[in-house]
């Protein structure tokens, strides 16, 4: 269920266990495994109480990461490396031109993982709307941030179906979060063509640049995203219902109509 639901505590309350300022570390371009090892090190220190909350901002070289629910049919056919990870979800791609943010924070008690995910989504929605994608929102039953098929992208090369702009994948251990969110900025969509991204085969993926018809760099997207994320975690930005219904896949609809026509012809 992706639509907001009543959280375990008031929506205007911080979801963090600490009110100390967050540390933001900009890692530049870093290999996925190295960044994952760094996350694990920080998360262990945070759980032990020897480290405060940290947000890592990073860009990865091209790589696929497979979450715990990845299926064999999701896997790539282009030979690019796949790293099995301990987050939720299925397979996705990370790479050049994609802004990746890993909040490593201690969640307030009682831990509400769903509320945490919704706050991450809300931050992405707020940021991409501020950048100009005014119809960005949620699809019920699917995580992440989407643009509906009823919205035409400024770049005609953009996909036409419902399309995902921001992806989420998290892990919470001992009340401390790992992994996080990825926002497509200037990246190519080529690598998504070789996988079933997030296990979804009836929708597409897009970028801020395609949606707005101009180059939207990671540097441009970073400031509004981090600002919205800090507000969402603190409770200043509350989760709202930006949910829209998933549009039927036109190819599947056409195939079903053809199947029904063949069946009707055979019955005559």
Swiss-Prot record:
Its EC number is 2.3.1.181. Coiled coil: none annotated. One of its GO terms (biological process) is protein modification process. InterPro entries: aa-tRNA-synth_II/BPL/LPL, BPL_LPL_catalytic, Octanoyltransferase, Octanoyltransferase_CS. Gene3D superfamilies: Bira Bifunctional Protein, Domain 2. Residues 49-237 form the BPL/LPL catalytic domain. The active site is at residue 198. It comes from the Bacteria. CDD domains: LipB. Signal peptide: none annotated. It holds the Pfam family LplA-B_cat. It is found in: Cytoplasm. Pathway: Protein modification; protein lipoylation via endogenous pathway; protein N(6)-(lipoyl)lysine from octanoyl-[acyl-carrier-protein]: step 1/2. One of its GO terms (molecular function) is lipoyl(octanoyl) transferase activity. The record marks 164 as: Lowers pKa of active site Cys. Keywords: Acyltransferase, Cytoplasm, Transferase. GO terms for cellular component: cytoplasm. Its main location: cytoplasm. Substrate binds at residues 87-94, 167-169, 180-182. It catalyses: octanoyl-[ACP] + L-lysyl-[protein] = N(6)-octanoyl-L-lysyl-[protein] + holo-[ACP] + H(+). It is an enzyme of class 2 (transferase). In the reaction, the free carboxyl group of octanoic acid is attached via an amide linkage to the epsilon-amino group of a specific lysine residue of lipoyl domains of lipoate-dependent enzymes. PANTHER family: LIPOYLTRANSFERASE 2, MITOCHONDRIAL-RELATED (PTHR10993:SF7), OCTANOYLTRANSFERASE (PTHR10993). Belongs to the LipB family. Catalyzes the transfer of endogenously produced octanoic acid from octanoyl-acyl-carrier-protein onto the lipoyl domains of lipoate-dependent enzymes. Lipoyl-ACP can also act as a substrate although octanoyl-ACP is likely to be the physiological substrate. This is Octanoyltransferase. It comes from Corynebacterium aurimucosum (strain ATCC 700975 / DSM 44827 / CIP 107346 / CN-1) (Corynebacterium nigricans).
